[in-house]
């Protein structure tokens, strides 16, 4: 088996995790108590969904996941919620005091006390796997726990499970909406770790997803539940090929191989189509070409950044539902002819496609309509550098005055770490710039190694 372990860190990670496991259970027909009435093979470990669930002798399915937070309130909602019987109590790990939006607390003082316990639980899950293929790590970089403990855990996972791939689903601060004043600090410090210790990081931001909910689903005031259910659809589409059998299956390591041209250039944009409410879906049937086009629309991107301002290096299209390869090829051919969608000239093909015959499932009573087919796109575009330059700018404004820095230093962090992390991000922005332009100069020689410092 090729198992995947999900790690949900901090409030954002845990709440996105809730939405994801709710959806996985619906997709596989697993009840909130972990039983699966439709399962013919009780206790047999080779069903496709066993990549995400382990099965006990009694036929109960337990998610291969851990939920971590430095304070109990958010995880308590899992402990008392609908799916409380699904998880083993040991999988829900909480501390007593929170990171207070402070990276240093999550990474040094408070995170340090809990991290060994977390790794211990993750080790138990890993020992339960026959062929662990990697980790999915869910967190945000704006708060303290997701950024600090998230970074610490990734560093430790790199040591303990060196070669296993780590995919991060990371909520980045939005341009306009902020939940904390010190977000830029936490983000820069945490991205420094994400650069080193994740293989692929998919960037999400709340503002972009708010806008999608408002525009496409007519939700006037979207809640976090609305946002998380949309994110869950994306993550479900990416992992569908691990959990179901399909025509063109995509492995976790395949994402890496196809999307990451240079080790540092691994921050992805994602989009999902069709995002459509039940009233509208009643009147329209969306073709493969239409959903593919809409996945490339700037408005569909789940992070606030305009792909028209950059070039694509690679792009992964994961279709699910009633889709045949012929339609996909036609849709991709059309995309390639569009002038607005530019690829760097050293990446001539640039597309990886996956098809899964399981149609998308929706949460009953949720916002999304049940559709026949859907597509999720993950793309590596130089435009993502916009996200970093925005955060860097805010970081610089605050750091020039050393505002709020004492909170970090007081928790045992050195001031040099700020400048080190900031320089690393400056180098990253430069890397993106070079990757987009390096192919025009010279005779293509430095194109081979120019962007990989």
Swiss-Prot record:
Residues 429-453 are annotated as: Disordered. GO terms for cellular component: cytoplasm; microtubule. Acetylation of alpha chains at Lys-40 stabilizes microtubules and affects affinity and processivity of microtubule motors. This modification has a role in multiple cellular functions, ranging from cell motility, cell cycle progression or cell differentiation to intracellular trafficking and signaling. It catalyses: GTP + H2O = GDP + phosphate + H(+). Residues 431-453 have a biased composition (Acidic residues). The keyword Methyltransferase does not apply. Its cofactor is Mg(2+). Mg(2+) binds at residue 71. It is found in: Cytoplasm, Cytoskeleton. CDD domains: alpha_tubulin. SUPFAM superfamilies: Tubulin C-terminal domain-like, Tubulin nucleotide-binding domain-like. The active site is at 254. Dimer of alpha and beta chains. A typical microtubule is a hollow water-filled tube with an outer diameter of 25 nm and an inner diameter of 15 nM. Alpha-beta heterodimers associate head-to-tail to form protofilaments running lengthwise along the microtubule wall with the beta-tubulin subunit facing the microtubule plus end conferring a structural polarity. Microtubules usually have 13 protofilaments but different protofilament numbers can be found in some organisms and specialized cells. Belongs to the tubulin family. This is Tubulin alpha-13 chain.
């Amino acid at each position: 088996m090729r198992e995947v372990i999900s790690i949900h860190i901090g409030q954002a990670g845990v709440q996105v995790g809730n939405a994801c496991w709710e959806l996985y259970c619906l997709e596989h027909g697993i009840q909130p108590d972990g039983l699966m009435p439709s399962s013919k093979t009780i206790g047999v470990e080779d069903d496709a969904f066993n990549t995400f669930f382990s099965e006990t002798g009694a036929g109960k399915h337990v998610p291969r996941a851990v939920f971590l937070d430095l304070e109990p309130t958010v995880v308590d909602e899992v402990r008392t919620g609908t799916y409380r019987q699904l998880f083993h109590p040991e999988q829900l790990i909480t501390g007593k005091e929170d990171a207070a939006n402070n990276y240093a607390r999550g990474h040094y003082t408070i995170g340090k006390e809990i991290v060994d316990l977390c790794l211990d639980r993750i080790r138990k899950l890993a020992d339960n796997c026959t062929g662990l293929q990697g980790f999915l790590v869910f967190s945000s970089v704006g708060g303290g726990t997701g950024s600090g403990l998230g970074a610490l855990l990734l560093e430790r996972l790199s040591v303990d499970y060196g070669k296993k791939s780590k995919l991060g689903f990371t909520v980045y601060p939005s341009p306009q909406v902020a939940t904390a004043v010190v977000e830029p600090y936490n983000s820069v410090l945490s991205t420094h770790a994400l650069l080193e210790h994740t293989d692929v990081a998919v960037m999400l931001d709340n503002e972009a997803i708010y806008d999608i909910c408002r525009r496409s689903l007519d939700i006037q005031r979207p809640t976090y539940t609305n946002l998380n259910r949309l994110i869950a659809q994306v993550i479900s589409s990416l992992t569908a090929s691990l959990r179901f059998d399909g025509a063109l299956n995509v492995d976790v390591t395949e994402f890496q191989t196809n999307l990451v041209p240079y080790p540092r250039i691994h921050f992805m944009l994602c989009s999902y189509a069709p995002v459509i409410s039940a009233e509208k879906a009643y009147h329209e049937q969306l073709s493969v070409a239409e959903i593919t086009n809409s996945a490339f629309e700037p408005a569909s991107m789940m992070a606030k950044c305009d792909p028209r301002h950059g070039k694509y290096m690679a792009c992964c299209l994961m279709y699910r539902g009633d889709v045949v390869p012929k339609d996909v090829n036609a849709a991709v051919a059309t995309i390639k002819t569009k002038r607005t969608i530019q690829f760097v000239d050293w990446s001539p093909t640039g597309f990886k496609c996956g098809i899964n015959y399981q149609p998308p499932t929706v949460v009953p009573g949720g916002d999304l309509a049940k559709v026949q087919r859907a597509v999720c796109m993950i793309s590596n575009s130089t435009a993502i550098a916009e996200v970093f330059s925005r955060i860097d700018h805010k970081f610089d404004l605050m750091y020039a005055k050393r505002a709020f820095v004492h909170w970090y230093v007081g928790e045992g962090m050195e001031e040099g770490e700020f400048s080190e992390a900031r320089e690393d991000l400056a180098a990253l922005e430069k890397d993106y710039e070079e990757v987009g332009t390096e192919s025009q100069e010279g005779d293509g020689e430095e194109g081979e190694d120019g962007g990989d410092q």
